[in-house]
């Protein structure tokens, strides 16, 4: 239990760093803060996988209900509150926001913003839902994750535990290549908003989840040492901070 608390403490520290980085980015203080989104995606993929393994028998219904309560319901609530506040301003009409609001509630806002030529990095962006592209990708991932998890787990349990890890690693490589290719051939926003170019982060998290559950028990004892753990963890944090400080969206 103590190890589990320490484990989640490390994850909470990473989350806190990512949240602060995003905030500082939007305050024009940290130019690479937008990279924290990748960190959130990795954590989402990882935690989804680890949580699914905790269920003796994975339930699709239970998973979807959980995601509706934790992700979709709060998002929908914020959306309707935003629309209520917007309605108080006479120069802003609901009908102008209807297509965008629909895309938010149906989970395809990232593609809507892409089609509408929205620029996330434009400081004058006026949409109240400019940041909801991230939630759209999470919703799309949550829609397919149960199927991916069940298939990969069956392959791992029936044949070899390495198979899910290898498959997710291949998917990470494919998505990374797609990310790189589209960044060269397309507008940067096509790469930024596109679900397929973001899958590398999510599948990397899923891969780590399978590695954790299948191979966590055979990690050498020296790596489980609390001092070694802290050194690795804080080295990772330092690497993140360097990326957040020195990376800009054109790189």
Language model regions located:
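Short, Lys/Arg-rich, polar N-terminal cytosolic tail immediately upstream
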Residues: 1-7
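Hydrophobic membrane-embedded alpha-helices
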Residues: 7, 17-251
